[in-house]
């Protein structure tokens, strides 16, 4: 238990920040899940790219707010766009085989 006035305030502040950070983390993780779900459901190229851009923006915001480290943000974006690019290549391959 905190004894001093400043220690009590630190507890309040850290709890508030923990909840805010958790909200940012949940937000960008859900954006990533939306992209993955769109890929698994075979959504059109435009939809997947738009969702990927929104996920990228959410990750960048979390990095700028200090919720996650910039290297972790870069790694998450890289893995996300690797999946997106593989999906887009498979769509292009499917289009060429149909023609």
Curated annotation (Swiss-Prot):
Residues annotated as transmembrane: none
Keywords: Ribonucleoprotein, Ribosomal protein, RNA-binding, rRNA-binding
Name of the protein in its database record: Small ribosomal subunit protein bS20
Function, as annotated: Binds directly to 16S ribosomal RNA.
Disulfide bond sites: none
NCBIfam families registered for this protein in UniProt: S20
Pfam family, any one: Ribosomal_S20p
GO biological process, one term: translation
GO cellular component terms attached to this protein's record: cytosol; small ribosomal subunit
GO MF terms, alphabetically ordered: small ribosomal subunit rRNA binding; structural constituent of ribosome
Family: Belongs to the bacterial ribosomal protein bS20 family.
Superkingdom of the source species: Bacteria
């Amino acid at each position: 238990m905190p004894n001093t006035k400043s220690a009590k305030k630190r507890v309040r502040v850290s709890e508030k920040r923990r909840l805010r950070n958790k909200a940012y983390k949940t937000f960008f993780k859900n954006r990533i899940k939306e992209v993955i779900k769109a890929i698994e459901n075979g959504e059109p190229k435009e939809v997947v790219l738009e969702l990927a851009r929104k996920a990228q923006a959410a990750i960048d915001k979390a990095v700028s707010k200090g919720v996650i480290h910039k290297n972790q943000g870069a790694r998450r974006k890289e893995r996300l766009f690797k999946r997106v690019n593989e999906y887009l290549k498979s769509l292009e391959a499917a289009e060429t085989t149909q023609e």
